[in-house]
From Swiss-Prot:
Chain's role: This protein binds to the 23S rRNA, and is important in its secondary structure. It is located near the subunit interface in the base of the L7/L12 stalk, and near the tRNA binding site of the peptidyltransferase center.
One Pfam entry name: Ribosomal_L6
Assembly and binders: Part of the 50S ribosomal subunit.
Family per similarity comment: Belongs to the universal ribosomal protein uL6 family.
Biological process terms in GO annotation: cytoplasmic translation
SUPFAM superfamilies recorded: Ribosomal protein L6
Keywords assigned: Ribonucleoprotein, Ribosomal protein, RNA-binding, rRNA-binding
Protein name as catalogued: Large ribosomal subunit protein uL6
HAMAP family associated with the record: Ribosomal_uL6_B (MF_01365_B)
Taxonomic classification: Bacteria, Bacillati, Actinomycetota, Actinomycetes, Mycobacteriales
Length: 179
């Protein structure tokens, strides 16, 4: 049995979960999220009102989907109650970010500014020209947007310039030695 998959998902007060076959709809104070769980995985409520994820057999694919499905549903519950935030920072001379309406505009050493449009459910906040946060209720969207932004200018291993997650340690390389 999957150690993660067999744990029930507690449902906090103020969260309404609707299970309709393979579809899960989670409503909470921050918004609404839905998910379609893979076919063999089954969802149900136990006596305490928590969500229980089960699988029909121990086939390899079903074992893999068991823990994944439980984690995805748990992420929905956390998203509609607390939300997700990713903090990022920019290193490099002249590199900066600024908010233009709901979009984020970057100066990253290219000949043009790079504009990232905020998808539905995602908000950007700029604390300083070199620090900003990405906030939303969908963990996958927040993570994907932050990865896309980091990809605009990956941290350089020689000088450390670029966009990185807050607290991320960049493995530095030693440059060439002179003659």
């Amino acid at each position: 049995m999957s150690r993660i998959g067999k744990q029930p998902i507690p449902v906090p007060a103020g969260v309404d979960i609707t299970i309709d076959g393979q579809n899960v709809l989670v409503k909470g104070p921050k918004g609404t999220l839905d998910l379609t769980v893979a076919e063999p995985i089954m969802l149900a409520r136990n006596d305490e009102g928590a969500i229980v994820v089960t699988r029909p057999d121990n086939e390899r694919r079903n074992r893999s989907l068991h823990g994944l499905s439980r984690t995805l549903v748990s992420n929905l519950v956390t998203g509609v109650t607390q939300g997700y935030t990713v903090s990022m920072e920019i290193f490099g001379v002249g590199y900066r970010a600024q908010l233009k309406g709901s979009n984020l505009e970057f100066a990253l050493g290219y000949s043009h500014p790079v504009v990232i449009e905020a998808p539905e459910g995602i908000t950007f906040a700029v604390q300083s020209p070199t620090k900003f946060t990405i906030t939303g209720i969908d963990k996958q969207k927040v993570g994907q947007i932050s990865a896309n932004i980091r990809r605009l200018r990956r941290p350089d291993p020689y000088k450390g310039k670029g966009v990185r997650y807050e607290g991320e340690q960049i493995r530095r390389k030693v440059g060439k030695t002179g003659k």
